[in-house]
């Protein structure tokens, strides 16, 4: 009987632990050349640094699961915390990408801006897959691949799509 109780308690503890959200990890992302880096820490917030001198260039509020920094050290893009998965009850107002310049957000790209037709979305078991953010290239363009396979390049200095 004692063994049965021990097994039951062990299983219930492991089930409870498995259903808990993941802890917020610290996140470090280098620019294409490695000159600058973005650091997002759950306790200290997010900041952009000169990688050689370890000098903070600017900061932004909060923690961000996914962020991309340009070589100029002035521009950064944050991605929706759900990454490439959207809830099935999504709102067209949900922000997929936020463009920042030296600590100030200057443009949001929302679901309605990037996914004009929800038919583009791919259904998973519990969510919708909307696309993949590949990162910022040496020319300061954020490459985003939508779920339908169409590629977009966003000029990070203006937060709008540009020609390849």
PLM regions with names:
Residues 17-60:
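Terminal domain-start segments
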Residues 27-35, 67-74, 131-140:
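Blade-terminus and WD-like Trp-Asp/Gly-His loop motifs, strongest in beta-propeller folds
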Residues 36-39, 75-78, 143:
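Structural core positions within WD40/WD-like beta-propeller blades
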Residues 40-43, 87-93:
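Short, solvent-exposed loop/turn segments at conserved positions within beta-propeller repeat blades
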Residues 61-66, 113-116:
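Short coil/turn segments at the loop-to-beta-strand junctions that recur within blades
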Residues 82-87, 149-150:
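Short glycine/acidic-enriched loop and turn motifs that connect beta-strands
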Residues 92-103:
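Beta-propeller blade signature
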Residues 107-127:
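Surface-exposed loop and turn segments in beta-propeller and other repeat-based domains
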């Amino acid at each position: 009987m004692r063994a049965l109780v021990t097994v039951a308690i062990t299983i219930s503890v492991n089930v409870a632990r498995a259903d808990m959200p993941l802890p917020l990890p610290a996140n470090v992302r280098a620019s294409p050349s490695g000159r600058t880096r973005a650091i997002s820490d759950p306790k200290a917030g997010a900041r952009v640094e000169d990688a050689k001198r370890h000098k903070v260039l600017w900061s932004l509020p909060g923690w961000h699961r996914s962020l991309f920094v340009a070589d100029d050290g002035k521009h950064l893009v944050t991605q929706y915390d759900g990454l490439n998965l959207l809830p099935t009850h999504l709102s067209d107002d949900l922000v997929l990408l936020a463009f920042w310049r030296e600590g100030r957000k200057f443009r949001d790209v929302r679901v309605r801006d990037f996914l004009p037709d929800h038919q583009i979305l791919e259904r998973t078991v519990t969510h919708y897959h909307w696309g993949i953010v590949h990162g910022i290239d040496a020319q300061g363009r954020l490459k985003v691949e939508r779920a339908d396979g169409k590629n977009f390049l966003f000029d990070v200095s203006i937060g709008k799509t540009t020609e390849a």
